[in-house]
Structure formats: C-alpha cells, structure tokens
UniProtKB/Swiss-Prot annotation:
Taxonomic superkingdom: Bacteria
Protein name according to UniProt: Large ribosomal subunit protein uL16
Record lineage: Bacteria, Pseudomonadati, Pseudomonadota, Gammaproteobacteria, Moraxellales
Keyword Signal: no
Biological source species: Acinetobacter baumannii (strain SDF)
Assembly information from the UniProt record: Part of the 50S ribosomal subunit.
Length: 137
C-alpha cells in the first residue's frame, strides 16, 4: 500500500478540494493516459486496485506510470466512542483529486489495449474519468 515514509505532522485538517488541476494535467511520460473529470479522493487501496486492473490487462506489454500518491492521512474514531477526546487515529491515506488530473499513463502498448485497460481501471475509481492521448507539437 502506498503511503509516505515520514511526514512533518501525523494528522491534517480536513480542508476543501476546490479548483482545477493545473499541475499534473498533461500527458508527460506515456502515450495515453486516464484523466479525472470530477473531483474526489482516491485511497491508497483504490490506486493499487486500478494499477492491478491495468497491469493484468496489458500483461507484460508496456510500462505503467502512476501519477498520483496518497499523501493525506484520514483519521477515524473507533466504533461506539463518544464525541470529543481529541482527533481519531490515522486509518488510511488518500490523494485529493481535482478535475483535469492525470492519474495513470501507459507507454508501449497499442491504443485499443490501453483503452480496454483504462476502462477496467475506471470501474475501480470513485469519480468519472476520460482517456486522453499525448499531443505532439
């Protein structure tokens, strides 16, 4: 499971996920990519599930680039615990996704196979996505 090796602080404020993704919004490493069209959170488990779906479909054909990393800790209190008494324990890690963010890229496979793999991966994600290709200038 993906998570930071160390962080400056153990717990963070909830915050608000607003705006569009300007960084990480272009296809940089591969030839075809999957891009978020809605905002949301992607847990480390979802990142891994989508990666496995892609790698199972393309087998040993190409290279997968993961462009997201879960760097935000999410805390939860145990069941049947009263309110108050401080913030809960860190349960899992998420990556805040803004519309326009590139999530995964593939290099070295034909476009039809990559589209099939991304369709399988999109089913594992909690927001809408689209498939984009690299534009050559």
């Amino acid at each position: 499971m993906l998570q930071p090796k160390r962080t400056k602080f153990r717990k963070v404020h909830k915050g608000r996920n607003t705006g569009l993704a300007h960084r990480g919004s272009t296809v940089s490493f591969g030839s075809i990519a999957i891009k978020a069209t809605e905002r949301g959170r992607m847990t480390a488990r979802q990142i891994e599930a989508a990666r496995r779906a892609i790698s199972r479909r393309i087998k040993r054909g190409g290279k997968i680039f993961i462009r997201v990393f879960p760097d935000k800790p999410i805390t939860e209190k145990p069941l049947e615990v009263r309110m108050g008494n401080g913030k809960g324990n860190v349960e899992y890690w998420v990556c805040e996704i803004k519309p326009g963010k590139i999530l995964y890229e593939i290099e070295g496979v034909n476009e039809d196979l990559a589209r099939e793999a991304f369709a399988l991966a999109a089913a594992k994600l909690p927001f809408k996505t689209t498939i984009v290709t690299r534009t050559v200038m």
